[in-house]
Amino acid sequence: MAIRKHKPTTPGRRGSSVADFVEITRTTPEKSLVRPLPKKGGRNNTGRITTRHKGGGHKRQYRVIDFRRHDKDGVDAKVAHIEYDPNRTARIALLHYVDGTKRYIIAPNRLQQGDVVESGPNADIKPGNNLPLRNIPVGTVLHAVELRPGGGAKLARSAGASVQLVAREGKYGQLRLPSGEIRNVDVRCRATIGEVGNAEQSNINWGKAGRNRWKGVRPTVRGVVMNPVDHPHGGGEGKTSGGRHPVNPNGKPEGRTRRPNKESDKLIVRRRRTGKNKR
């Protein structure tokens, strides 16, 4: 993938860029692997906004991705196409298995049309192959990693993401995550070899607010610039600080949303670097 920069023909295109999509080999998805994806606009079943800044955007179809691959152990699959997926930053690969089944997977870096991939404990160590952590050499770069055996891939699924298997002790393998955190994961959990492709995605300059609207993202407006009828921080003469601890439009406290005593915290070997310690 490469980034194509636009010429400054209009203010919105000045400085903006777009992916060249050179790796895409087909523009229409596999019909049997798409599902309707109705828009919710951030509303729940009662019609109230539960997630702000969502709405509009281009119509999409959901591509069903195989995040498990357990049931295809020992069955070879040929990469038929590399496709665009509007629901994620990574590209997806359409696999044609020798038994006639078709599946989508996250497309790792350097995976190309015509390659053959496989899954199972005896698979080769090459991009796109899926194995349990107990069968992967220490030091290997991975993506689409399970957190629980059979639970499906949860870690390192977005464009350019990867984790590294840095050690293996007993029933746990130690993974270095993109944040710098080192975490124990059961060696029965599966992972796919290689890093996720489309790493240049993070370098795209969207250029104008309208391109965000195409993605279904609405503007983010601070509460302190609203009126009192719209937000607890609104109103006042001139600039104000809000006058209270940060709250959401419903008056509930905002910030610090992560539980400090999660059960899975005991699996963390070294915490991610935060604040001044990031360097």
Swiss-Prot record:
Which SMART domains did the record assign?
Answer: Ribosomal_L2 (SM01383), Ribosomal_L2_C (SM01382)
Q: Which GO terms describe its cellular component?
A: large ribosomal subunit
Domain of life of the organism in this record? Answer: Bacteria
* Record region (Disordered): 30-59, 225-279
| Chain coiled-coil ranges | none
One annotated GO molecular function is: transferase activity
Gene3D superfamilies per UniProt: 2.30.30.30, Nucleic acid-binding proteins, Ribosomal protein L2, domain 3
GO terms under biological process: cytoplasmic translation
Q: Please give the start and end residues of each transmembrane region.
A: none
Give the protein's biological function.
Answer: One of the primary rRNA binding proteins. Required for association of the 30S and 50S subunits to form the 70S ribosome, for tRNA binding and peptide bond formation. It has been suggested to have peptidyltransferase activity; this is somewhat controversial. Makes several contacts with the 16S rRNA in the 70S ribosome.
| Description of how the protein assembles with itself and partners | Part of the 50S ribosomal subunit. Forms a bridge to the 30S subunit in the 70S ribosome.
Q: Which HAMAP family match?
A: Ribosomal_uL2_B
- What is the protein named? Large ribosomal subunit protein uL2
| Organism whose genome encodes this protein | Kocuria rhizophila (strain ATCC 9341 / DSM 348 / NBRC 103217 / DC2201)
User: Lineage of the source organism?
Assistant: Bacteria, Bacillati, Actinomycetota, Actinomycetes, Micrococcales
